[in-house]
Amino acid sequence: MKFALATLACATSAAAFQPTTFLRAPVANVAADSSSALSMRYKVAVVGGGPSGACAAEIFAQEKNIDTVMFERKMDNAKPCGGAIPLCMVGEFDIPESTVDRKVRQMNLISPTGVEVSIGSTLKPDEYIGMCRREILDKYLRDRAIEYGAEAVNGLVTSIDIPQNHKTSDARYTLNYLEYSEGSNAGKPSTMEVDLVVGADGANSRVAKCMDAGQYNFAIAFQERIKISEEKMAFYEEMAEMYVGDDVSPDFYGWVFPKYDHVGVGTGTVVNRPAIKQYQKAIRERAGDKIAGGKIIKVEAHPIPEHYRPRRVQGRIALVGDAAGYVTKCSGEGIYFAAKSGRMAAEAIVKLMKNGTHLPTQAEIESTYIKDYDGLYGPTYLVLDVLQKVFYSNNGAREAFVELCNSKYVQQVTFDSYLYKKVQGNNPLDDLKLLGETIGCLVKGYAVAKPDQEFSNPVESQKRI
């Protein structure tokens, strides 16, 4: 569910896509003998094997002075996710086309009153939005990290013993985890000492809790994978759909995204999480005959962070991906930012380690990884936050949003912003014209829209994770 309302952010977004260095030299597996600077050998634990963890582990594994251990409880896990990835990720992270189920070149936006706008006419023939199944993409990234030398542990990290003086170079972290053998549901309690930890274990991050990273507000994303007939699947060959309206979500959107041989149908909300199944029923009804008669083959639900964690580095523990809160508002995009943050964190830490002669401090990690990431993408998160508040707040604004997407200028900068994580060719005159169109569309939208249904859940809305 990753690219929906990047639309108007394009005119003001300041984030630019700047590929980071990606080491490719193969490394030999050398047994760890000490974590001292004299032996130039350290152990890094990457907790989580999704895109953020796998991309971090891949960088660490290519360093001869680092032993890399990657923990993942469910190696075949299919995380609830729309599965959209931008074109720049395919190239930057060397994603093979075999992991891309569908190449979406057209997006239908459907307003609360049923007005449809198709976007995608500005795309070049070789441009597309990739649709992936997370179980396929994640496995590919994990396997690549393992090929470079990362040790994969099928285990669940339950807690971390953090020494009182953990900001000093001679202190080590003890990971307590359950290790699972193949075919067993019972985990064997185990421990491991490491010099540095990267928390890539998702929105419900145990690493974040152990390091007292603070809480954040969250959305619930709910998705059903529905197998439909080949005839109906043909409609979604290169097509995705986005539905807006308070019937499908009071603050987000509903989607129908094509997968390999089925569609993902889902929605999400922050402000009314208890009603998520009601909203899911509504998105199925609005999709109507296009998915009628389909068989639900999988039901998925998962929390999605709404903003950064208050603390993302503590001592030599750093958070990346969903654990850090790197999911954009409006679009709910997280895969690219997970992979990017994992890589950026690992590259910064590797550089700070100076060929195994130095363990980085909290201040050093914050002044490199955190500063660089926020400098690149902070403006994008801010703008999309504002846009979500403006265009997802009520049905009148949602009607205006869909109508605005008729603009070829909006479509052009939308796809430039999403596909390449940069804005190309913004024209001040066109931006000024867009402002006028926005005001006009809002006036018209409020005139035709039906009132939003009222709801109240003051206790649930205060919950944080």
Predicted segments — roles?
Residues R41-S52:
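Beta1/beta-strand and adjacent pyrophosphate-binding region of the FAD-binding site
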Residues L123-R144, V270-Q278:
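Short beta-strand to alpha-helix junction loop
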Residues A45-V47, E58-C81:
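Glycine-rich FAD pyrophosphate-binding loop
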Residues R73-T113:
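N-terminal FAD cofactor-binding segment of flavoenzymes
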Residues I59-Q62, R144-G293, G325-Y326:
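Predominantly flavin-linked oxidoreductase catalytic cores and closely associated redox partners
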Residues S159, V271-I349, M353-K354:
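FAD/FMN-dependent oxidoreductases across multiple families
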Residues V350-I465:
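C-terminal helical "tail/cap" subdomain of flavin- and related membrane-associated enzymes
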Residues K2-V27:
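N-terminal chloroplast transit peptides
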